[in-house]
Amino acid sequence: MEKLFHLKENHTDVKTEVMAGITTFMTMAYILAVNPSILSASGMDANAVLIATSLAAFVGTMCMALMANYPFALAPGMGLNAYFAYTVVLTMGYSWQMALLAVFVEGIVFIILSLTNVREAIFNAIPLTLKSAVSVGIGLFVAFVGLQNAKLIVNSDSTLLTYQHFKGETFHSVGVGALLALIGVLIIAVMLIKQVKGAILYGILITWVLGIVCELAGIYIPDPDAGMYSVIPTAFVSFDFSSLGKTFGQVFNLDFSNFNIVNFIVVMFAFLFVDLFDTLGTLIGVASKADMLDEDGKLPRIKGALLADAVATSVGAVLGTSTTTTYVESSSGVTVGGRTGLTATTTAVLFLLASIFSPLFLTIPSFATAPALIVVGFYMMGAVAKINFDDMTDAIPAFLTILVMPLAYSISEGIAIGIISWTLINVLTGKAKEKKITPLMYVLTVLFILKYIFL
């Protein structure tokens, strides 16, 4: 174990790493329920997608552990799965098999880019100030996702968003869930202040147990139409894997009769773009939080991390799921001390077990995992202290990066706005030479501008 993961060198131990891996899994487990729900809208079998999701997460996260020795976990990405189902299939009219082909090709392109150091060069070209801003922006993004998952922040026709009202007919479902999420935040906060190891994991489990008690007492009433399901497990294991055959290998079973090469390239590039910068943003944010970046702001062994992400995407497409990517929820495990691939290995094994214990894992409610995301968001805000607000050419792009991520609901959009604004502001103020803007930053700026014009 020591030879494989270098625990002493990273100032950690087996217990801490395992606890961190469990914590990461618990905050990511929702993807096992959400991904099948989204991709089934494209005509894919929900049970097959669930198994493919758990297997893709296992393969990707194990690759991360063994190729890079980092505590980062992978799974089919949110946002990309919605683009897959609702845009590529339902709007553009492609079959889900063709959409899987686009994901598969994207993964192959990523493997090539990773082996040729292109992705690593992009990572290293981003200035340290923007890397800190990305960490803060991701923190706000994660906290916002947590507030949404808890139903504490909901849609509003008049103000776009508003807080959850605790009166009315939805109180015993959405309202109680939101209150339990608030209690969960308090539980985690108190345990963190008391320096209880595994506070985030315990917070998730305690909130889940409170939900079970409330449901048994009739205080919490499930309402599937509102996304509030029963939190009491009705079964623990399922050994039926036959449904995987409905998606496995279907990426190569295609009908090219309505194939349009231009549209296909656009779709593939869209997957490529979002996955590339979401992954880079996540690696920057989580690694920054764990103090894994060196003094130049570079991430050691990044090639292995990027290659693991690329391999996972192509493998996931063959299994039958949308783009597999590095998850920002990995920061929850890092927050409780995860520093090596042993954390990722633990998470990977749990995803593999999830394919068997899916009935149990799928009952973990979103209001139990939401507090973890909110607290992780708080932790990631600490990177704001690394931003030099005395230098406006750094501070304004950093601010825009932080602002756009949660409001645009996109890590990649925040990075795009940050890079464009940082380059243009420094050029227009005559500080291009002083800031040593690399040619790659100019290229990225032009590409991002073209993306907003044509895509």
PLM regions and their residue ranges:
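Residue-level signature of catalytic and energy-coupling elements of molecular machines
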Residues: V18, I38, I122, G198, ...
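Helix-loop-helix junctions within the multi-pass membrane cores of secondary transporters/permeases
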Residues: M1-N35, A56, G77-Y86, L90-I138, ...
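Membrane-embedded alpha-helical modules
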Residues: M92-V209, T345-L455
